[in-house]
Amino acid sequence: MTWFIDRRLNGKNKSTVNRQRFLRRYKAQIKQSISEAINKRSVTDVDSGESVSIPTDDISEPMFHQGRGGLRHRVHPGNDHFIQNDRIERPQGGGGGGSGSGQGQASQDGEGQDEFVFQISKDEYLDLLFEDLALPNLKKNQHRQLNEYKTHRAGFTSNGVPANISVVRSLQNSLARRTAMTAGKRRELHALETELETISHSEPAQLLEEERLRREIAELRTKIERVPFIDTFDLRYKNYEKRPEPSSQAVMFCLMDVSGSMDQATKDMAKRFYILLYLFLSRTYKNVEVVYIRHHTQAKEVDEHEFFYSQETGGTIVSSALKLMDEVVKERYDPGQWNIYAAQASDGDNWADDSPLCHEILAKKLLPVVRYYSYIEITRRAHQTLWREYEHLQATFDNFAMQHIRDQEDIYPVFRELFQKQSANQSA
């Protein structure tokens, strides 16, 4: 008997290649569906998979068929409605059930298909969600490239020192080798033992045949025992390799207004923006630190859980958060070694005399040392003094960006606008 071992990478997922091709082919339609679906999710359910629907017209394949024009003479068996030279009306398209999108009027005729719906995984969802996004102005810190390497596990190797030997992997290889080398002999041994048992109970006794079988069985057992328990071919050693440390270190400051003017709906939109930002950073970069700052009249550095779930509130002094950020930067993040980013979310309501101070802190202390500072204002009201002060900063500093969010549907487009990957010419 011949044995086939399937060593293909996608042996259990044979449609993976076709699935990836489908995702590439209909990426535009899938991304459009994802951008619509993300606004319908709860704050805590942003990073799960998604059911994606694509209009049937977008996935229809071109096909060759006979046109409806011209004159043709045909004979169709079983016809009891028409005779020769009758004219057949062209079928009416569009009907009521043609598209399945639920946008048309009811109709008594017409045919169609529902939109094509399929499920994408969490990884596929996040890849498409954050495609073409990047931290702006990310630069490599040159002195971080000098002789900084870190040892990483890199699988197993057949050569190495005894101290790195992997006992478990070596024994697994030994068992596999012995099983493969003795499989045929063991099957033959089992057949001979069965035959010997049958002959030993037969009448009259077949002594010569029984002796021959015993001799062959002994020879097979000897051959099986000769296969070494462990061989140098089986040995596997833990492999290590040195990889250079990432030369770009980055820190993201998240500044969220939690004052009394921020109602629950506004806070939820701010949290949704920051959850998108957190997923984007953790998905795209491996060595980005995040500093969370909540503020009302006073600012406080908090952990991730308190940032998203704390109920503390109060008045509004935005400059308190900017002062705290400046202190943390000076204490922990040297601009010569770190790429510093900040994302600030507020409803724009601030003590009037404090807005010029915010302008001064940003212009003199923060914007000269950060790579990129983004400000989103979540409000349906008219802009106030903070927005106007920040407009002056945007006109002066290239690394300052500001966007306005009115409704939940604006969050993802604004997020993509703020972190759209720059072209080579723009980044230069």
Swiss-Prot record:
Domain of life: Bacteria
Residues covered by region (Disordered): 78-111
Biased composition (Basic and acidic residues): 78-90
InterPro entries found in the cross-reference section: UPF0229 (IPR006698)
Gly residues composition bias: residue spans: 92-103
Signal peptide positions on this chain: none
Pfam families documented for this protein: DUF444
Family the entry assigns: Belongs to the UPF0229 family.
Name of the protein: UPF0229 protein YeaH
